[in-house]
Amino acid sequence: MKRTYQPNRRKRKRTHGFLVRSRTPSGRRVLARRRAKGRWKIAV
């Protein structure tokens, strides 16, 4: 059986990257929430 996590750097960046997050209002909300929480990494 194929595992669910098939690592791919490009896909990772394009779906969860900083630029993608900052593009939409909800994504910016995600970044703001993670900044407020004090996350060491706010995006991939």
Swiss-Prot record:
Pfam families hit by this protein? Ribosomal_L34 (PF00468)
Region annotation (Disordered) maps to: 21-44
Q: Does the keyword Transcription apply?
A: no
Q: Which GO terms describe its molecular function?
A: structural constituent of ribosome
Q: Which UniProt keywords apply?
A: Ribonucleoprotein, Ribosomal protein
Q: What organism, scientifically named, is this protein from?
A: Pseudothermotoga lettingae (strain ATCC BAA-301 / DSM 14385 / NBRC 107922 / TMO)
PANTHER family for this protein: LARGE RIBOSOMAL SUBUNIT PROTEIN BL34M, MITOCHONDRIAL RIBOSOMAL PROTEIN 34 FAMILY MEMBER
Q: Which GO terms describe its biological process?
A: translation
Question: What is this organism's lineage?
Answer: Bacteria, Thermotogati, Thermotogota, Thermotogae, Thermotogales
Q: Tell me the protein family, please.
A: Belongs to the bacterial ribosomal protein bL34 family.
Q: What name appears for this protein in its UniProt entry?
A: Large ribosomal subunit protein bL34
- This protein's source sits in the domain of life called Bacteria
Q: Which InterPro entries match?
A: Ribosomal_bL34 (IPR000271), Ribosomal_bL34_CS (IPR020939)
Basic residues bias locations: 30-44
Alphabetized NCBIfam families for the sequence: rpmH_bact
A GO cellular component term found in this entry reads: ribonucleoprotein complex
